[in-house]
Amino acid sequence: MSWLQVKVLTDEAGAAALEQIFEGLGALSVTMLDAADDPVLEPDLGTTPLWRNTQVVALFSADTSAEMVREQLERNQIAAADIECEVIEDRDWEREWMTHFHPMRFGSRLWICPSWGEPEDPNGVNLLLDPGLAFGTGTHPTTALCLTWLDSQQLQGKQVIDFGCGSGVLAIAALLLGADHATGTDIDPQALEASRDNAERNSVSEGLTLHFPEQMPEMQAEVVIANILANPLISLAPKLATLTLPGGSIALSGILKDQEEAVAEAYRNYFELDPTEYKEDWVLISGRRLPY
């Protein structure tokens, strides 16, 4: 079976209008992607994350006329150069994903590896993932920054909190790197289920506890990590500081370069901050909890 796929490059202001146009033309699905094909981070409640350069992708049945779709888009002031139409064949998408997911190294020890292949470094710390359980695999710069930071820490025997855990990759990496216990929290039940499945695949289920934020017990940990977004991080500064033991370490990401100072300012009263780490347009802010 084949499909007509139509892609349009736009900005965040035009994405919602395009979605309505595509739905009016009978699209079977409409997806919004970062033009760089980066995955979605955890958004603020009730919001849809859009990027400065957004690609809107619509899927139609094969008998849909590409010329008709083009004509309607151009009537709505969409430049012809921004429209891409392609007939795609139905595929085994799981196998397609498998061909593109290769081992990735973070720091000196840590690897993210597909579970069906041989580890690149049998003596390394290998975190195994499968299709369907792998959102937050390390391909996004913020995840990569967090994984590299974890690899640089001395985690043996420590408690770790992964606040906004998503697929649990950061908590699981901490356990594989020697942490005694990790606590993950997320507002999304699917994220908690993915974390549970990924922990089981990596044989660290006994060391991982998962909670919705409102059900999280009063606790403190030597290491706290939060890869969410800048605005939630700013509002959560008192909470995350309370979760971090005096002298403990924190790492924060999901922060764009132009948001760095606002996030850092929210945490300076609680932490002695390290030099910021950068990857592409994203940053990681880390530090140690002050004793007061």
From Swiss-Prot:
Catalytic reaction list: L-lysyl-[protein] + 3 S-adenosyl-L-methionine = N(6),N(6),N(6)-trimethyl-L-lysyl-[protein] + 3 S-adenosyl-L-homocysteine + 3 H(+)
User: Major location, coarse class?
Assistant: cytoplasm
This entry's Enzyme Commission designation comes to 2.1.1.-
Q: Which Gene3D superfamilies match?
A: Vaccinia Virus protein VP39
Molecular function (GO) terms for this protein are:
protein-lysine N-methyltransferase activity
Which residues bind S-adenosyl-L-methionine per the record? 143, 164, 186, 227
Statement: the UniProt record of this protein carries the keyword S-adenosyl-L-methionine: yes
One matching Pfam family: PrmA
First-level EC class:
transferase
Q: Which InterPro entries does the UniProt record give?
A: Ribosomal_L11_MeTrfase_PrmA, Ribosomal_PrmA_MeTrfase, SAM-dependent_MTases_sf
Superkingdom of origin: Bacteria
Q: Where located?
A: Cytoplasm
This protein's GO cellular component annotations are: cytosol
Instruction: List keywords of the entry alphabetically.
Output: Cytoplasm, Methyltransferase, S-adenosyl-L-methionine, Transferase
- GO terms classed as biological process: methylation
Family classification:
Belongs to the methyltransferase superfamily. PrmA family.
Tell me the function of this protein. Answer: Methylates ribosomal protein L11.
Query: Under which name does UniProt file this protein?
Result: Ribosomal protein L11 methyltransferase
Upper taxonomic lineage = Bacteria, Pseudomonadati, Pseudomonadota, Gammaproteobacteria, Oceanospirillales
